[in-house]
Amino acid sequence: AVCGLGHAHPKIARALSDQGQTLLHTSNLYDIPHQTRLAERLCTLSGMDNAFFCNSGAEANEAAIKLARLKGNRAGNHTPSVVVVDGSFHGRTMATLTASGSRKVQAGFEPLLGGFVRAPFNDIDAIQAIADNNPGVVAMLVEPILGEGGIHIPDSSYLTALREICDRHQWLLMLDEVQTGNARTGRYFAYQHSDCLPDVVTTAKGLGNGVPIGVCLARGEAAELFVPGNHGSTFGGNPLACAAAHAVLDVIEEDGICAHAETQGRRIVETLRTALAGNNAVKEVRGMGARARR
């Protein structure tokens, strides 16, 4: 999920070396051209309007949760909650481990934070029931494909149905693409396999190919929630991390990585299904692009 383009990729290594000889870090009080251009590229790829840069997927998801709480509080809802799903993983900060649907991740860190409502993954009826009975909900945070939960791919209509529920109830639909983004599933983002356009998208891991970087992307109302002083990051979007991310995006585009991941992923799944057919120890082979599990 991190070094999707391999180790010591020559283009990325060269970009890091070149940037390292000029400017590694500067205050974000100044205009950082690399950062501005990267924000523009990511917004174009995702259909979002704004980008908040940080250093990891957990930080990006933390920013998304803060956006949701800001939305609620500014509307007079001082106990806003976010819908999350069983089996999910969103990080190891207090907010993101609470949002995660894994007791293993949460164990020993009680008391967990409030403000989250849980539902089964890939269960639209459960989400609708929450919408009907929980007026304090302001957003839903979900992975398009459950990662740590076992590479579970939802029904093809799942994200579209979530989008409809969120629209009806004025929730933000926030997608955690930390593991599925950056061409890993055969599209730049996994939600692009559907007609769904979220309000918030988080990405990290493969965007830096080993260099720490995370991004919380937002559009529409969600893009206007943060104002100066609401949130920040000392190192987020620094010139070195942005140089790495630009090189990653260049390679993904120039080498046709999305199409390659889709083709190779299909081949891997088909090969595994054939090789493991009749093996009683194997229940199912699941995968999309360069993500597979048996």
Feature-to-residue mapping (PLM):
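Conserved N-terminal phosphate-binding loop of PLP-dependent enzymes in the Aspartate aminotransferase
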Residues: 1-294
